[in-house]
Design a protein with these regions (language model features):
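Bacterial N-terminal signal peptides
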Residues: 1-6
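Acidic, surface-exposed loops and disordered segments
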Residues: 7-185
Length: 185
């Protein structure tokens, strides 16, 4: 038996509503993100589940405009117009200790999604941009942030006050779901 919230129940549940209405925002105003909001975003990231509670992450919050430009690699765009970027990194010293060594990407991805949802809940816009495993991006981000070899950038979350409000898309596709076994209805 599967429990599914009706559409009306979904719209009344704030957590579900936040998930269903989050969209990628790529255009931002000049307004800075407050230190309190930055800490809230980082706390949300650190609240993510991790394999064997390893918490194998390190976050770099970037607000300096020159550093944001350097992170953009001279390509301009989102990183140069945003107020904040949070680079989510895996800490290999933590990752390689004990059990759960293979799970740092999943753990840091869960933290990334928490930050994206927290940004939306705070009225901020955000978009997830990839880093790892693209060697050129990893090297560029690592150089810009002076990361030690044991800290690997997974992704950069570009964040700011939205200058656009795209309509959320309903991405539900029942053909992408099976029950009990592949192809099960």
């Amino acid at each position: 038996m599967f429990f599914v919230l009706s559409i009306s129940a979904q719209s009344e549940n704030e957590a579900i509503k936040n998930i269903m209405t989050r969209t990628s925002i790529r255009k931002y105003t000049d307004q800075p993100v407050s230190k309190a909001d930055i800490e809230t975003l980082l706390r949300a990231g650190m609240a993510a589940p991790t394999a064997v509670n390893k918490q194998p992450w390190h976050f770099v919050a970037v607000t300096d405009k020159a550093k944001l430009k350097e992170l953009s690699g001279g390509r301009g765009g989102m990183l140069e117009q945003c107020a904040l970027a949070i680079v989510v990194c895996g800490n290999m010293e933590k990752t390689m200790q004990g059990k759960g060594q293979e799970f740092w990407i999943q753990d840091c991805s869960a933290a990334t999604e928490n930050i994206l949802l927290a940004a939306h809940a705070l009225g901020l816009g955000a978009v997830w941009t990839g880093g790892y495993p693209m060697e050129e991006r990893v090297a560029s981000i690592s150089k810009a942030l002076k990361l030690p070899e044991t800290i690997i950038p997974l992704c950069t979350i570009v964040i700011g006050h939205p200058a656009e409000r795209p309509t959320p898309k309903d991405k539900w596709k029942p053909e992408n779901v099976s029950y009990n076994e592949f192809g099960g209805k």
